[in-house]
UniProtKB/Swiss-Prot annotation:
UniProt keyword terms in alphabetical order: FAD, Flavoprotein, Oxidoreductase, Tricarboxylic acid cycle
Entry similarity comment: Belongs to the MQO family.
Keyword Mitochondrion set for record: no
Record-given protein name: Probable malate:quinone oxidoreductase
Pathways involved: Carbohydrate metabolism; tricarboxylic acid cycle; oxaloacetate from (S)-malate (quinone route): step 1/1
Enzyme class: oxidoreductase
Cofactor requirement: FAD
Pfam families: Mqo (PF06039)
Species assigned in the record: Corynebacterium diphtheriae (strain ATCC 700971 / NCTC 13129 / Biotype gravis)
UniProt-listed NCBIfam families: mal_quin_oxido (TIGR01320), PRK05257.2-1 (NF003606), PRK05257.3-2 (NF003611), PRK13339.1 (NF009875)
Amino acid sequence: MADSTTAQHVTDEVDVALIGAGIMSATLGAMLRTLEPGWTQVMFERLDAPAQESSSPWNNAGTGHSALCELNYTPEVKGRVQIDKALGVNEKFQISRQFWSYQVNEGVLPSPREWINPVPHVSFGRGEDQVAYLKKRYEALAAHPLFPNMQYTDDRAKFAEMLPLMADGRSEFEKVAISWTDAGTDINYGSQTRQFLKAAEKNGTEIRYGHEVKDIKRDGAKWRVTVKNVHTGDTQVIRANFVFVGAGGMALPLLQKTGIVEIRGWGGFPVSGQWLRCTNPDIIEQHAAKVYGKASIGAPPMSVPHLDTRVIDGEKGLLFGPYAGWTPKFLKKGSYLDLFKSIRPTNLMSYLGVGAQEFGLTKYLITEVMKDQAARMESLREYMPNAKDEDWELVTAGQRVQAIQPVVGPRFSTLAFGTSLINSADGSVAGILGASPGASIAPAAMLELLERCFGQKMVEWGPTIKDMIPSYGIRLATDQKLFNEIWDHTQATLQLDKK
């Protein structure tokens, strides 16, 4: 019996098919448009507008992740703070700043302050152990070129001056400390995505909203992408030279449909998120920082609490969280069958392995799911002692799908925290799995994709890539002069030097 997809008529031939109208597809589309302006691009989005899932501003914390304040990137091992992960994340964020600056100058991202704003990044420690750790972390980072102008204090007066909401009502006997930098950012990835896609359409990219990708199958050296119009039910088949799956949580099921061996064994563990959002403008105005604390012992990195200033559509906001929940859906607007449909004979052991090993995650999720509003407010009061119930509302954030990476027995799998790139051996299809730091390092992830999937083009593309990202191929951690030049340039171009 003939495959029904194969039997269908191909309606379009394109060079690049992008699945999902979020920040990942938008970033790759912009890169390829710069490198190969003659290539045809088409983008498919199941919903009727871009950036409605994880890229939407209230579906994420909007932190420009560069390890300035996030303590999970600097673990303490045998009494020493390890900064390797922090350096790696920071280097990748510098790539983002350079790429965004290039796109600003090219008119692709014409209004940077609509999506990026300067907000201090602060690390918070309470109690003897956390304060001692925070000082060691500060000393390790402050001496490094990638972390200029880091500051630290355990002085209560300075703490109260910087973070009045966190100081007000706090016991004078509790030991606290903070380290901070004014180099932090708050980013509205929804607004950034919309600017990217407005330019993409102007430059010839066709974006089909309300179109859901149902299948992806090999067709010789190309791919047949079956797409359904969610409003009319009509089905089309597009043949593409290259397919990118930037569909957030649905990247796993779509990559499974390709049949590539590289996706075998991978799974996804969905975690829903919630925030407490402040509704009192007077309270919101008293806080101007993104403050990250330390996760509880044994808790996963996703549990790190933070009290965040947001700047969305020109208005300040304030949120606290995240609080986790559990649902089998892979997208906020997904299906309750998503998780179960993703389980295959090739990844069953991966799911079982995670279930047997991740006791910390299991305990954390059970604790979070059992929390009522009173318990959530108690967690907030560890940061903001005088928080009042009537000033905060519970909102649902985006859906995260933690990637489950296959490993050899006896463990069979491990949770891959971060962002994982999966691509076929011939480089004709690729996709992104995982969550944070996600959007913050999208340009670095797409550079890695170009190297893996278009290796034969990299020599030709090299000069243009260097125009977009002057530090390409250079570790800024070892080149203070170049870092300073790039920092000053991107600060000015992104208008981060203006209050």
